[in-house]
Amino acid sequence: MFDITLVHAREILDSRGNPTVEAEVTLSGGAVGRAAVPSGASTGEHEAVELRDGDNARYLGKGVLKAVENVEGEIAQALGGMDASQQRDIDMRMLDLDGTENKGRLGANAILAVSMASARAVANQLDIPLYRYLGGVNGNILPVPMMNILNGGAHADNNVDFQEFMAMPVGAESFSEALRWGAEVFHTLKGVLKKRGYNTAVGDEGGFAPSLKSNVEAIEVILEAIQQAGYTPGEQIAIALDPAASEFFKDGKYIFKKSDKSEKTSEQMVRWWSDWANKYPIVSIEDGLAEDDWEGWKLLTDELGDKIQLVGDDLFVTNPERLARGIDNGVANSILIKVNQIGTLSETLDAIEMARRNGYTAVISHRSGETEDTFIADLAVATGAGQIKTGSASRTDRVAKYNQLLRIEEQLGAGARFLGIGALNYDGDLSAE
C-alpha cells in the first residue's frame, strides 16, 4: 500500500518569481503526495545547497531543471518500490545517493521536495491530516505567530539595517485570536506609516518596507500601531526581531550600511541588544550576531540568555551538528527550523528533538521565497514547537500557512492548545513593560 510506484518533479515558480522544485510521489495504494520547496534571500553560509542550472538564457540562471532531472532520474530509480512510511529509510537512501556533506550533487531542493512529498503521500493514503501522521496524538499545540510586519535588510529596498520586525500576540488565548490581533496591528500600522508620510509597499514576506529615519523608528511605529489597535505592548503583543546580522558583518565588524554607516564590535552589538531589550517589549531576537561570531554569541547569551529568547538561524542552519556545538558552548537558547536549510524531513525532526532535549525552543519558519505549500503549518503542530514564523497578514504565500493553521485548530476543537508566552524561552515580566 505504501510502496513508491512513481516519483515525478516539475519546475514551478516561488513567490518572488524564481523557479523552484515541486515533486509528486505516488504509492501502490493509489495516493499521491505533492510538495514544493521554498528558497531564501538571506542564506546562511552553512546551509544545504540549492541546485540551480546557471544557464543565463533561462530565468537569469536560476532554473532548476537539473534538480528536476535528478528527481526523475537517480532519485526515482533509487526509491522505486521502497516503503514511503519508513521516512528515515527514504531520506537516508537519498543522502547516500547524493554522497556529499551539503547535498550539492543532487541538490537539497530535489531531495527535500521528495522527502516532504513522501510524507504527504503516506498521510493521504492513511486518509489522515499531515500533522496527525507526523505528530501522532501529541500533535495538538497551535503555534504563536511571529508576524513580520516591518521589513528591512535583505528583504527590502530601504534604509533599515535589520531584516524583520515582528509582532507576537503572546497574550492571546487561542491561535485564531492571536492571528486576528496580529492582522489588526498590521492594518493599523499601515495607517501609522501613511500618517507619517511613508510608503506602504510590502516586502518579500508581506511586511511594510518604508524608508524610515532609523532602526529605532521601526520599533516606535510598531509600538504605536499596537496601542492604536487597542492592545497593550508587551502584555498582549510583544516584539520579536530578526536582524540577520550576518548580512551586515564584514571583516570582524558590524556595519550599519543601510542607515548611518556606523561600525560596531561584537561587544558593542551585545550592548545594543541589551539596551533595546531593557527599553522595549522585546521577547525574542534571532541572529542578533553573525553566523560564525561564536565568541560574540557567547557574550550575547551570557547577557540576555536567561531573560529573552535568542534564536539561531544562520548560526545553526537547522543542522544538528551546529546545534550541538551551540549547546556545548552555551550559545543561544532557541533554533529556527527551516526545512530547506538541512534538506530532509528526518534531519529536520532530529534538530527539533535535539533542541527540545537540551532546553532549547524551536521556531518553525518559512523562507522569503515561498510557495502555496502549507507543509510547515502541519509541521509546527505535529512537533508541538509552539511558534511559527511565516510572514505578515498579506500575500497569499504567507496567509496560506495561517489559513491551514485555522483549519487545524478547527479540526482539533476542544483538544487544541495554545501556549502564548509559555512557548518561548522568556523570563521577563511582560506586565511591567
Swiss-Prot record:
How many and how are cofactors bound here? Binds a second Mg(2+) ion via substrate during catalysis.
GO MF terms listed in the record are: magnesium ion binding; phosphopyruvate hydratase activity
Provide one Gene Ontology cellular component. Answer: extracellular region
Q: Please give the PROSITE patterns that the UniProt record associates with this protein.
A: ENOLASE (PS00164)
Q: List, alphabetically, the InterPro entries matched.
A: Enolase (IPR000941), Enolase-like_C_sf (IPR036849), Enolase-like_N (IPR029017), Enolase_C (IPR020810), Enolase_CS (IPR020809), Enolase_N (IPR020811)
Q: Name one GO biological process term.
A: glycolytic process
Q: What does the record give as cofactor?
A: Mg(2+)
Q: Would I find Magnesium among this entry's keywords?
A: yes
Localisation per UniProt entry: Cytoplasm; Secreted; Cell surface
Q: Where does (2R)-2-phosphoglycerate bind?
A: 163, 338, 367-368, 389
Pathway listed for it is: Carbohydrate degradation; glycolysis; pyruvate from D-glyceraldehyde 3-phosphate: step 4/5
Enzyme class comes to: lyase
Name the reaction it catalyses: (2R)-2-phosphoglycerate = phosphoenolpyruvate + H2O
Q: What is its EC number?
A: 4.2.1.11
- Entry keyword S-adenosyl-L-methionine: no
Tell me the PANTHER family matching this sequence: ENOLASE
Q: What does this protein do?
A: Catalyzes the reversible conversion of 2-phosphoglycerate (2-PG) into phosphoenolpyruvate (PEP). It is essential for the degradation of carbohydrates via glycolysis.
Family indicated by similarity = Belongs to the enolase family.
**Protein name as catalogued:** Enolase
